[in-house]
């Protein structure tokens, strides 16, 4: 709380399939409706951690899919404190993208496809339902 300068734990991000850690480093989020936050993009926890702890000279030479940037569309309900996985979409595999919500159309702007390679692509999808 801003006045008391105290934070509380709201919970944790859901793990990836197989139980791997999820990170949202480089991801982006936006409010949706009166009780939801949409979370998209970001780097892969294991790939990013390994690159920091054990740098390899060929790290930047891999194809984009090797980096396993997050393709998940996650929704967090601020009332129930529950995460819902709304699907996987290749268009969301970005780090450092911008995001906007216009009349339930979510727009993803630019971002990195892999370390050092940015895209000028702008992708949009219509959000058909949210709690």
Predicted regions and their residues:
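Kelch-like beta-propeller repeat domains
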Residues: 1-131
